[in-house]
């Protein structure tokens, strides 16, 4: 009941933000101005969220029961802002989208699962293998298009691939859970698929209702306060994930360091491999796809499992937040150099690159 009350309160707040006239006046002027300021901070706010989440462990303990609700609201906001016209434009040339979708939803989890089995990691460290498999089977992060746009990359390509990949996850995740996760996962594969489908379908239905009531132009006009609200929800999720970070760091520093190194290694391995595979599509599009594939929506998998995962899996999820939150700051200079470099003959990304947002 508390969870339902919380999600209802946040949903009403989101609807109020969308429905508010701009500029705001009266009682809600100051809160909306604060949300707008927060939403305009860009990648700085993403880093600040992680640091703030680490700094307040007691809030993380309070936030843990609401992880599923936070993920649901983050999905609602993302679906609410999808540009249907952009989706249709990329669907006219689906070959690249289909290849990227197959790579991120089928090839990546298949390779991770096979690698763990062939090297014996699945038997030696089943909880860590579960973490890697949940990461690999997850859809890309819903924030991937926005992060691509922030770096001046092709956000529309990322958006359509994100949508197709997310739609397939309720079908592909149970298969990989059955083949590679075994009894380590407390849920049955069928239950996992149904929970994923329910979360995604519910978020899509709520987002569609908001779009129908207010219209896409109103949502665009309120971009800044919605971004600020999104950051607040992200803080709830990050706090829940990082609740035990400081205590675990003090208790087992070398273990935490090892998990952090692994999290960054997985991130850069997925990024680099994807860029190599799709280099013929253009360097900027290859990097955009690399960003999307390396930023996995582990929160969705955490929501589907309702947090019923082993301690090591929780710790890996916590350490994986560092490459996720630091990626825009780390990779933006590289993306700028990539765009400024001379193009090889025949490579043309013009008119396909979404402009960067400050």
Question: What are these regions, as identified by a protein language model?
Answer:
Residues 15-358:
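Alpha-helical transmembrane segments of multi-pass small-molecule/ion transporters
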Residues 1-21:
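N-terminal amphipathic/basic-hydrophobic helices that include classical n-h-c signal peptides
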């Amino acid at each position: 009941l508390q969870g339902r009350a919380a999600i209802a309160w946040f949903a009403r707040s989101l609807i109020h933000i969308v429905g508010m006239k701009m500029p705001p006046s009266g009682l809600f002027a100051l809160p909306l101005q604060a949300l707008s300021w927060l939403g305009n901070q860009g990648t700085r706010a993403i880093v600040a969220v992680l640091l703030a989440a680490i700094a307040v462990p007691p809030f993380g303990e309070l936030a843990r029961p609401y992880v599923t609700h936070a993920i649901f609201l983050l999905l609602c906001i993302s679906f609410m802002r999808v540009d249907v016209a952009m989706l249709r434009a990329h669907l006219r040339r689906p070959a690249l989208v289909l290849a990227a979708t197959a790579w991120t939803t089928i090839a990546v989890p298949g390779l991770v699962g096979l690698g763990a089995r062939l090297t014996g990691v699945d038997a030696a460290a089943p909880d860590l293998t579960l973490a890697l498999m949940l990461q690999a089977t997850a859809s890309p992060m819903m924030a991937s298009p926005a992060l691509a746009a922030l770096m001046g990359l092709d956000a529309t390509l990322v958006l359509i691939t994100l949508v197709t990949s997310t739609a397939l996850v309720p079908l592909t995740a149970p298969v990989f859970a059955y083949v590679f996760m075994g009894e380590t996962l407390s849920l049955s594969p069928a239950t996992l698929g149904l929970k994923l489908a329910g979360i995604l379908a519910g978020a899509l239905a709520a987002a569609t209702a908001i779009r129908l009531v207010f219209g896409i132009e109103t949502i665009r006009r309120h971009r800044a306060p919605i971004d600020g609200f999104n950051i607040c929800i992200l803080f709830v999720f990050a706090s829940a994930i990082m609740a035990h970070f400081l205590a675990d760091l003090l208790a087992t520093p070398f273990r935490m360091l090892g998990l952090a190194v692994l999290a960054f290694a997985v991130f850069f391995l997925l990024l680099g491999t994807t860029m190599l595979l799709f280099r013929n599509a253009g360097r900027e599009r290859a990097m955009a796809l690399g960003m999307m594939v390396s930023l996995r929506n582990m929160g969705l998998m955490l929501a589907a499992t309702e947090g019923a995962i082993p301690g090591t899996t929780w710790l890996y999820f916590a350490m994986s937040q560092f490459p996720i939150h630091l990626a825009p700051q780390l990779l933006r200079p590289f993306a700028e150099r990539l765009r400024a470099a001379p193009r090889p003959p025949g490579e043309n990304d013009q008119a396909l690159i979404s402009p960067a947002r400050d």
